[in-house]
Amino acid sequence: MTPCKEPPGGARNLLILTLSEFALIERLRRRLVGPPDQIWVGDDVAVVPAPVGAMLLASDAVVAGVHADLRLVGLDDMGWKAMVANVSDIAAVGGRPCCAVVTVAGPLGKIDFDLLYDGLTAASSAYDCPIVGGDLTSSDTLVVSVAIVGDGGGGDLPAPVLRSGARAGDAIFVTGPLGSSAAGLHLLQTGRVSEAPDLVLAHRRPRARLDEGTAARLAGATAMIDVSDGLAADLRHIADASGIGVVLERVPVAIGVNRVSNDPESMALGGGEDYELLFTAPDPDLVESTFAARGLGKPLRIGRCTGDAGERRLRDGELPALGWEHT
């Protein structure tokens, strides 16, 4: 795979360069197909059916040069990532996405917005989360901001799972091995894409774990977060919010990461953007049986929660301060 260049050029891009802001909005609006019971893009407000029970709201932004290097990935990858990062936040409380609004700020004469929306709409379709509106404005830096409304459910479902409910004695689980995205980014940065296309794809097109989030919620998860900042950082987030200690007994490293890094465990601990779900639960047998009953892979048990609120251990040593920090 050849690293993508931006802007891509071609006849489509030449057309976009000539469009006014309102004409571009209309062009993008025609790409969005919504359910018939919604008032669609064109009004300043989208009217959507309200969830029964808890309503979930998530918002996150992807900034070119900060969260996406457009010398290495395409605008469609940036759009995909912006949507999936928010869907993953909904998954991390055990909810389901309902709809999204997308705000894009960027240099209107230099960006192929159709390509950007290829990624946004592909992700919204993959996760059944229609784009119902948004905004478009001019900016020197490309920023894609997505806000999602989600359904937290009600009735017999347990409450949505926050990161603050872990208790001493809970086991710590993660839904899959880690480090794939960081390894893929490293391959892109070093021009070694052909060595492990699956790792590159894990970075370019991450996946949200919606079904796993629901299963963890049904299995009595007490705290949950998606692994976006890195296992070490996100485990600290749970421990800090819950006021408990944590002992990480094993670090599950994804297949192939050891071929990319001399320190694959550190890549798994600090790489981030894997979007696996990290959760705590008191009953490991219930976790295993609930995931199995829903046809999902067995979560990996990686540690335990303790009553010492200051404890942050990796095996017999200190949990390293790895991962992404938002400043």
Which ranges hold each PLM region?
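Short, compositionally biased
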Residues: 182-199
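A short, N-terminal amphipathic alpha-helix
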Residues: 82-93, 124-126
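Glycine-rich anion-binding loops of enzyme active sites
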Residues: 49-52, 62, 96-186, 304
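Glycine-/charge-enriched secondary-structure boundary and capping motifs
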Residues: 10-33, 73, 107-132, 137-144, ...
